């Protein structure tokens, strides 16, 4: 978002940031959030979990400046509990690595690297949620025709998946 504001980029793929009135956010994809636990964890093997059941365990959590942090905070608020944050991480692959090494459990996007790590991936039964990835652009910025065409292509290609 900062790069858009500084006009370093024409477009960005990101989480939606509230209170960004000068930016258009177009939803282009859904992203699944899951609970990731070490393979030998007592929640492993269950297939799915209520987020409230994760509250007693130390969590590897996204940093405050991550676009996912408010989304995950809101999910925990809906459970009526507060996670025990053991570590804060900016990048999801690093988060997965810490979980694999028994530093805690995590709520994070279901990313391909999880298949290669010593972790178990659990669907979130409750609370319900939807997470979107957005294409962002400045509302008042001139965009080259090729950029406009790319935006239209992304909207048409991914809009069907939403």
Predicted features, each with a name:
Residues 16-17, 39, 109-112, 133:
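Short secondary-structure boundary segments
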Residues 44, 58-79, 143-151, 161:
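Secondary-structure junction motif
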Residues 15-16, 82-91:
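Short beta-strand-to-loop elements that line the ligand-binding cleft
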């Amino acid at each position: 978002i900062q790069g858009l504001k500084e006009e370093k980029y024409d477009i960005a793929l990101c989480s939606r940031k509230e209170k960004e009135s000068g930016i258009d956010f177009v939803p282009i994809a859904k992203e699944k959030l899951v609970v990731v636990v070490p393979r030998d964890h007592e929640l492993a093997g269950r297939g799915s979990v209520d987020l409230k059941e994760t509250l007693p365990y130390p969590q590897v959590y996204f940093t405050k400046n991550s676009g996912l942090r408010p989304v995950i905070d809101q999910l925990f608020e809906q459970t009526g509990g507060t996670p025990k944050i053991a570590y804060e991480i900016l990048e999801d692959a690093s988060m997965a690595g810490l979980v694999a090494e028994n530093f805690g459990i995590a709520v994070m996007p279901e990313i391909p690297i999880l298949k290669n790590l010593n972790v178990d991936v659990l669907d979130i039964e409750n609370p319900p949620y939807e997470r979107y990835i957005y294409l962002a652009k400045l509302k008042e910025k001139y965009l080259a025709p090729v950029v406009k065409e790319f935006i239209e292509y992304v909207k048409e290609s991914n809009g069907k998946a939403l």
